[in-house]
């Protein structure tokens, strides 16, 4: 097992991780921005107001993107374990 191979597998693992976490982080960022703009325009200074919409939005996004996220991580894991003898040898 060469160092280039290990680096490419680590790169693919990081890519899959970013691809899976990206939609949830983007939804949380967008909802947080909308709530912050709402708080700035109405001059509400409640710090806990931003958490509930973010949690609800991320849970809804998890329900929506969950099957895709699961299939993506499952295909990566299946590829990793099916080629394990090539990796170790």
From Swiss-Prot:
The chain crosses the membrane at residues 18-38, 55-75. Pfam families: Bac_export_3. The keyword Transport does not apply. GO terms for biological process: bacterial-type flagellum assembly; bacterial-type flagellum-dependent swarming motility; protein secretion. Keywords: Bacterial flagellum, Cell membrane, Membrane, Transmembrane, Transmembrane helix. It comes from the Bacteria. GO terms for cellular component: bacterial-type flagellum basal body; plasma membrane. InterPro entries: Bac_export_3, FliQ. It is a multi-pass membrane protein. It is found in: Cell membrane; Bacterial flagellum basal body. Belongs to the FliQ/MopD/SpaQ family. Role in flagellar biosynthesis. This is Flagellar biosynthetic protein FliQ. The lineage of its organism: Bacteria, Bacillati, Bacillota, Bacilli, Bacillales. The gene is fliQ.
